[in-house]
Swiss-Prot record:
This is Ribulose bisphosphate carboxylase large chain. Pfam families: RuBisCO_large, RuBisCO_large_N. Binds 1 Mg(2+) ion per subunit. Belongs to the RuBisCO large chain family. Type I subfamily. Mg(2+) binds at residues 201, 203-204. Residues 1-2 form a propeptide. One of its GO terms (molecular function) is magnesium ion binding. The modification N-acetylproline is found at residue 3.
Amino acid sequence: MSPQTETKASVGFKAGVKDYKLTYYTPDYQTKDTDILAAFRVTPQPGVPPEEAGAAVAAESSTGTWTTVWTDGLTSLDRYKGRCYGLEPVPGEENQYIAYVAYPLDLFEEGSVTNMFTSIVGNVFGFKALRALRLEDLRVPPAYSKTFQGPPHGIQVERDKLNKYGRPLLGCTIKPKLGLSAKNYGRAVYECLRGGLDFTKDDENVNSQPFMRWRDRFLFCAEAIYKAQAETGEIKGHYLNATAGTCEEMIKRAVCARELGVPIVMHDYLTGGFTANTSLAHYCRDNGLLLHIHRAMHAVIDRQKNHGMHFRVLAKALRLSGGDHIHAGTVVGKLEGERDITLGFVDLLRDDFIEKDRSRGIYFTQDWVSLPGVLPVASGGIHVWHMPALTEIFGDDSVLQFGGGTLGHPWGNAPGAVANRVALEACVQARNEGRDLAREGNDIIREASKWSPELAAACEVWKEIKFEFAAVDTLDK
């Protein structure tokens, strides 16, 4: 190469490493309505300035790499780069900051949660300059959310399909979760639905194991559903878990469920993956199936307060990817969940427009426009004494799911279902009459138990059961 050519090639390009903050920290940037906005909890390594850490997050999750490259000159970094536009210290924490990052919409493929997460929560989480990193919240602009189908049907369509209004829906996870034969499993499903529940559910672990192959389970559960419907006059459902080792097998199971005429199938969306989940959601919308979503594996991602991703982000991702129900904790049961935080992401699942509210952990105003809502499912360590609190906390647009709280009844499965249905109807009636469920809840249950022996027996069994542990994931004070 001649000296003259070498000089021309090097114009505007200087090899080497430069601080991220020189390019990616832009505190004067005015965010656009079309930007995807992220709030990261950043814990820099000792000696790394917070501005450099925030800029590094913006760079490594968008266009940046560890050194200057000459191909930067072949594109417009100003158009495509992520920008750290704000930093604030976390109250009560040493060396933790909330870094606000804006991403141009053109960085992401339309209708793909997989692509969005590959960038925003990809390699940057292993970056050595950061001791820990957590994605606290994400603002998805309407320009991007409108490229998604979202939930297959949504809350109102589900109520119309089921012809059930004015109260939470009642469910039950069949236990023991593993080991039952398909015939005995179907028997438990029938007894619970016959006793008054709206739904029963496969546990997330139930796929197609040697003790109960999926097709056998589907057939016995369908028989149980039709028998219970005929005897009660109510529409019933069982969440048939279609999760499988391949997308093709998953769709095959969903096709079988549709051919059996059942109303709903189920998917483990984190272990199954967002691509598989979106594919199943599209199939469900096209074929009239409701889709129940289980969040197995979420705590691996969201439970640590300084690293990972908050569940409110996973909830938003699910609303984009597609699901009509999703598990959302209980506040009062055995699983993690502080009240204000839980109600924050419950609103993000159900409502069309959610205002920024840091007291509930919501960092950005979120406008879903017309994307259908998702029913939150309260499940895990709950029983009849929790019914007033659950009805008051979650309201009508929810599913209250009692596994052990139904099947653990001393008289059997059907009386357990009766006890839960009576408790729910008593709480809804009391609320509609203007009574305070939070203050009078126990009295309401005791009054109802006087004319329901099934409820009285349940009250006696679970009167001392509590799960009183402090939540790990709490709001910053």
